[in-house]
């Protein structure tokens, strides 16, 4: 059977000339893992299942590859290392597979205990919520769950030109305000973050500040990891926050993007990353303790994760496994350039949590430089996004 003949697989997201909103990962759960795949720690313990599972669905003109694992096993860059090694091995290039590091010692703890640079206090500590504020934050979050139960997870295809227009719009708005002089740097990630924050702010029933929660990857922040001479297939992400006032969040893209750039630049320095790690090492309970939340207790929490650096479309090459067939017009529609290359990918939790909302997963670019984003949002926010994308 061809993939377009399958009632579910034919609806997998495809690249479009204009921006589009398409079905989310939950519509394709059957292709991700077997029906009884472990979804909790208890499931892994009682089923004696392996930490990493592979689920293959084959069609005459396409193959769907599903990987499932607990997030404690690895992050997106660990997944990149795994898929890169897999591609090299299939091509008979085992000698090029990087050395696997960190199996017997924790390089992150070692870096925290032996800093190579100046020691600083954690700047986020000044914004950490006190007990009373944390209670207010929890009560507000609980109220939001009760009054806004409906959320929808969808996938967005954003053409290269659309994202570049967002970035240039942000830069132009800052230049018009004569901010930061002439040398204004706003990344595509900053622009997309600002775009998501603004959509949530404009769809909020009342003005509220927003705290964007980012995943900051240690592999790019600590010299001992950058120059390690191999790869770490594990989770090396810590939290970073962007704090946006209610007024700024509902305003122009430029100031939001600039604040995101400023906050992340401040928190991503080696001394600040080490300060964060030292606090975790000194009090491991902070990993699960809600007191690590920072910012305004009245803020809307908006988690972001950006996978663009993983460059899955560039490093995944399963062409040695292709038995026959050539690229078709359908391959081009899906963003593929050669048989055995990645045309689309997404991620989902095998266990849906009712508290998941206001989440953006920037999955990165396809072969045509289109950006793909999966988001879990309230219907009013989706209305704002569709209007902004020019869909309605």
What do these predicted regions represent?
Residues 1, 101-172, 202-206, 214-224:
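Short amphipathic alpha-helices and their capping loops
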Residues 1-66:
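Acyl-thioester-dependent condensation/acyltransferase catalytic cores
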Residues 23-43, 141-148, 155, 323, ...:
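Long, low-complexity, polar/charged, intrinsically disordered or flexibly structured peripheral segments
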């Amino acid at each position: 059977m061809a993939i377009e003949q399958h009632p579910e697989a034919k609806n997998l997201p495809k690249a479009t000339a204009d921006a589009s909103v398409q079905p989310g990962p939950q519509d394709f759960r059957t292709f991700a893992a077997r029906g009884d795949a472990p979804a909790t720690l208890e499931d892994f313990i009682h089923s004696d299942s392996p930490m990493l599972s592979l689920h293959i669905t084959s069609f005459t003109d396409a193959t769907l590859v599903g990987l499932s694992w607990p997030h404690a096993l690895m992050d997106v860059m660990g997944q990149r290392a795994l898929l890169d090694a897999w591609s090299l091995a299939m091509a008979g290039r085992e000698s090029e597979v990087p050395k696997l590091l960190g199996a017997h010692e924790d390089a992150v703890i070692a870096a925290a205990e032996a800093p190579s640079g100046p020691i600083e206090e954690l700047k986020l500590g000044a914004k950490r919520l006190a007990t009373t504020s944390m209670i207010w934050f929890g009560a507000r979050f609980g109220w939001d769950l009760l009054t806004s139960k409906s959320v929808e997870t969808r996938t967005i295809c954003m053409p290269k030109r659309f994202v570049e227009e967002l970035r240039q719009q942000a830069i132009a708005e800052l230049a018009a305000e004569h901010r930061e002089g002439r040398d204004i740097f706003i990344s595509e990630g900053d622009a997309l973050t600002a775009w998501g924050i603004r959509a949530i702010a404009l769809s909020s029933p009342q003005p509220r500040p927003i705290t964007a929660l980012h995943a900051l990857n240690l592999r790019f922040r600590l010299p001992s990891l950058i120059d390690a001479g191999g790869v770490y297939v594990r989770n090396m992400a810590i939290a970073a926050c962007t704090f946006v006032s209610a007024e700024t969040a509902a305003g122009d893209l430029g100031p939001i993007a600039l604040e995101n750039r400023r906050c992340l630049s401040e928190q991503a320095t080696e001394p600040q990353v080490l300060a964060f790690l030292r606090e975790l090492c000194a009090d491991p309970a902070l990993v699960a303790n809600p007191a690590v939340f920072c910012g305004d207790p009245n803020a809307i929490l908006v988690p972001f994760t950006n996978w663009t650096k993983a460059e899955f479309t560039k490093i995944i090459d399963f062409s040695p496994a292709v038995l026959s067939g050539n690229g078709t017009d359908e391959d081009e529609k899906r963003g593929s350039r050669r048989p055995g290359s990645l045309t689309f990918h997404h991620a989902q939790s095998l266990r849906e949590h009712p508290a998941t909302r206001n989440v953006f997963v920037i999955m990165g670019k396809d072969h045509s430089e289109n950006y793909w984003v999966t988001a879990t949002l309230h219907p009013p926010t989706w209305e704002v996004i569709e209007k902004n994308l020019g869909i309605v």
